[in-house]
Structure formats: C-alpha cells, structure tokens
C-alpha cells in the first residue's frame, strides 16, 4: 500500500451524503425521487468520436449542473460542489484536452463506511472527487441514451421513467398469475466483485471508441484511499460515482437476457433480483442453474446463505412485503414489518424528548419524512398502519409537550386553559406517572387533541396517504380514517 501523500480528515457518513447510490426508499423519504430525463443524444455506440461528445462544452456544463444539484461530500482533494462552476470555467477546456489526449488520470475515491440495515454491518462506499463526478456524469449522459433502449423490460433500477414501485407491482402481477414461489437472489458485494475485464468486454460490444472504454477502465482502477492509505482496485466498480448505476445495469443486463432466453418471470432493481416460479421444485432448480450462470459466465459471486427459495408471502422486496387477502386469495402489497420498524425508529429519533428544539423544527423534519415515506409506500395496503402510527406519533408529541410544561403549577394552568376542570387538572398536574403513561390519560388526550397537535404544524400519515390515493398512488384507499 502507498501513502496518499495528503492528510485527509474523515467523519462517519450516511447514505444521505451519497446521492448516486441511495436506495429507492431513501430517495422517496427525502422527497427527491424523480426519475431523471435522458438527455437528447442522437449518437450510437459505433460512433468513433464518442469521446469528443463526452467532453463537449455543453455536455460538461450539463454534468456540472447535475453534480452541483446532487450535492454530496467532497472527495480526497476536498473540493466542494460549490467550487465546481468556477473550476470548470477556468480549467474546462484544458481538462477536455487532457482527456482527449488520453493523459487524464482519475483520482482515487475516498472510501467510507455507512451502516447497513442489518445491525452491526457496514457498507463500503467510494466518494470520487467532484471533478471526477462531473466527468463520470458526462460519460453517463452520452452512454445512457445508447444503452437504455437495449435494457430489459424487467429492469427497473436507475432508469428514466421507472421506479421501485413499478417492480413491486409487476411482482404481484406474476404472483396472481400463479407464480407464487420466489428465488430471491443475493449477489455478494456486487460492486466489489465486478470482473473489470468482463465489464470492458461487454462495453466493447457496443462502444467502438476505444478511448472511452480506456477512460472507464481507468475509473475502475483508480484505487481507493482508506484511512489515509492508497489501495489498488484491480476488481470491482466503485459504488459511488454517477457512472456506477449505469455500469451495474450494463453488467446485469447480461443476466436479464439469460433469464428472458429461459422464459423466466422476474424483476430486477439494480442488483436486487427476484425470479418467480410456479412451484418450489422449479424455483430450486432455477436457483441452482442461475447461480451457475452468474458465477461461471459473469464471474460474480452469489451469496448462498441469503439466496433463498420461499413462498411469495415470506419475502421482502425493496422494503415491501406481500400477503394473501382472505376474501378472495389475491396477493396484495404491504409494508414489510422490517420497514415498519425502521420507520418507527426514525420517528422516535425525530421526536426525542431530550432534544431542545422547537415544534416548528421538529414538525418540519417529521413532515418531510412522512411525505417521503408515504409517497414511497403508498402503493401498499397501509390504511390501518397509517391510522395506528398516527395515534402512536401523537402520543409521542404529547409526551414532549408534557415534559415542556415541567412544573406541576404550569401543568395545572395549561390543562385548565384547555378546558380541563380544576380538580382534574390538579390530579394530573401533580401525578408522579412518567411522560409516556401520562400522554395516554383521558385528560391529557383531551387537552392535547388532534386540533392542538395539528396547530403545531404536524401532518399525519393518514392525510398524506389519502393524498397519494387521490393521485392514483394506490388502488385500495377506502374511506378516510379517523386519526387518534
């Protein structure tokens, strides 16, 4: 290992620092899940002057705007996205010339660890420098219009006009057509195990400008900086830059075509692939044969422990689960219990009693989360979940207010002000019960009802769900629910 030669400061990052590889669920929670438009591009892969189009001024300017809009942390050179516009105005032409001469060398990415959904496990992400993000974005803008039309109809991740919900709905269509057994494929450390030679070979079938393949290969081999030390990357594709999602789709399109050739029903969102079969026996056979193909032909690794065959009602896909409706046996979409727990953990975080924040600040954060969460999960049957969660969240808010009143004298006064009799106000105002227990008592519930909490700026899961229903987000909204 070589020392990177520059002192680098680190902090614990989360997926929110990293705009290119957020999950569909996280994008929705942030209210930024907007399928991107593919820029107009009339070129083909056979274009031997593709590199000139990549570094064309207009294409680079568009790439700068997109990278600035996406934000994110700085790479190893500490240049921020705010500095990009000025940098490219001054150095853009020289940079383009360096790339055209084949002399440009991408900088190593900064490797960071973020928590995975499984407790105690971490995911490695690579953060390229902001300049390299722009170049990768410029490459993606030229390649996307060429490759996207060739991708499978069963592929939904990181594609214009497609989203996770489409993949989940397609799953239920297959399930309700009799394909009720699922092969839930898990590719082990997909981005870290991509065979670079295989990737270059697949690219060369379409891209006839060898300079472009060479530039992409340099990005794959740019290396990483880990704890201030440089490490080579002779395998894998950095899970970090704007080009990574496209490269993953190009590689896994090989899997899609093989599954189509075999006549399988399947859906894929990035490296999350589900194959649906009519029987458990057929699913087991499919799992074994497709595992051999993935490892023998694509040189990727299948996680045999996590790749399972199960009934469709037992699996989790993109945060959703499936259940069989009793009245007619139809397979329906639900929010998976793990996703429910994750949502509650986030609400707890946003409504902690020990935070000295105003309700305006709390409600702003909570409302943004609720909107994003419901917008993502709105295709699920979640009317009851929304109602129950609203009641639980309101109790959380009441505990905050009860704690804010602190002294018995203040509590008695505030309760009386809200229509509680003096006798009852004294009884509750001097009670030694804890905040959570007090928040459920009839007097507190009456004094701090829905109207009061709404007046503090908080929205509800139910009202947001009804909005999603009104715009066609789900087919099973039913009548409005009363929020407790």
Please annotate each region the language model reported.
Residues 1-89, 477-479, 483:
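Non-catalytic, polymerase-adjacent accessory regions of viral genome-replication enzymes
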Residues 19, 23, 378-432:
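Conserved nucleotidyltransferase catalytic core and NTase-mimicking acidic/glycine-rich helix/loop elements
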Residues 55, 60, 108-110, 116-118, ...:
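Core structural elements
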Residues 73, 83-108:
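Amphipathic alpha-helical blocks
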Residues 98-113, 121, 150-316:
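Conserved polymerase palm-domain catalytic core
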Residues 124, 232-236, 348-362, 372-385, ...:
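Short, solvent-exposed helix-loop connector elements
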Residues 221, 297-365, 369-371:
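A conserved non-catalytic segment of reverse transcriptases
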Residues 405-476:
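Extended C-terminal regions of large enzymes
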């Amino acid at each position: 290992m070589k020392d990177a030669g520059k002192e680098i400061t680190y902090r614990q990052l989360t997926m929110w620092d990293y705009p290119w590889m957020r999950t569909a669920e996280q994008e929705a929670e942030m209210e930024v899940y907007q399928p991107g438009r593919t820029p107009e591009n009339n070129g083909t892969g056979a274009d031997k002057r593709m590199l000139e189009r990549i570094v064309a001024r207009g294409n680079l300017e568009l790439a700068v705007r997109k990278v600035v809009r996406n934000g994110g942390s700085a790479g190893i050179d500490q240049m921020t996205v705010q500095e990009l516009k000025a940098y490219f105005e001054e150095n853009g032409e020289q940079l383009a010339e360096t790339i055209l001469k084949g002399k440009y060398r991408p900088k190593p990415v900064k490797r960071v660890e973020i928590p995975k959904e499984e407790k105690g496990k971490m995911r490695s992400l690579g953060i390229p420098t902001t300049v390299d993000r722009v170049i990768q974005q410029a490459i993606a803008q030229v390649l996307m219009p060429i490759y996207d039309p060739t991708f499978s109809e069963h592929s939904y991740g990181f594609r214009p006009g497609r989203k996770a919900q489409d993949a989940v709905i397609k799953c239920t269509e297959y399930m309700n057509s009799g394909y009720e057994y699922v092969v839930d494929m898990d590719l082990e450390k997909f981005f870290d195990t991509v065979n670079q030679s295989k990737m270059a070979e697949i690219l060369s079938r379409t891209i006839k400008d060898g300079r472009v393949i060479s530039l992409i290969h340099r990005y794959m081999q740019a290396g990483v900086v880990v704890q201030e030390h440089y490490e080579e990357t002779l395998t894998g594709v950095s899970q970090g830059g704007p080009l990574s999602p496209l490269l993953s789709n190009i590689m896994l399109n090989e899997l899609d075509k093989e599954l189509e050739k075999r006549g399988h029903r399947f859906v894929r969102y990035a490296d999350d692939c589900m194959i649906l079969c009519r029987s458990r026996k057929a699913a087991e056979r499919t799992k074994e044969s497709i595992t051999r193909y993935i490892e023998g032909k694509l040189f990727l690794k299948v996680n045999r422990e996590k790749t399972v065959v199960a009934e469709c009602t037992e699996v989790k896909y993109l945060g959703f689960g499936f259940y069989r409706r009793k009245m007619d046996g139809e397979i329906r979409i639900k929010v998976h219990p793990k996703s429910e727990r994750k949502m509650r953990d986030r609400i707890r975080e946003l409504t902690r009693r020990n935070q000295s924040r105003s309700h305006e600040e709390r409600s702003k954060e909570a409302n943004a989360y609720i909107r994003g969460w419901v917008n993502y999960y709105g295709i699920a049957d979640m009317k009851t979940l929304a109602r129950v969660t609203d009641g639980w969240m309101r109790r959380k808010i009441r505990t905050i207010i009860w704690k804010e009143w602190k002294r018995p004298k203040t509590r008695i006064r505030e309760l009386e002000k809200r229509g509680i009799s003096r006798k009852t106000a004294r009884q509750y105002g001097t009670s030694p019960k804890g905040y959570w227990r007090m928040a459920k008592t009839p007097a507190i519930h009456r004094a701090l009802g829905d109207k009061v909490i709404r007046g503090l700026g908080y929205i509800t899961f139910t009202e947001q769900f009804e909005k999603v229903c009104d715009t066609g987000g789900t087919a099973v909204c039913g009548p409005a629910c009363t929020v407790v």
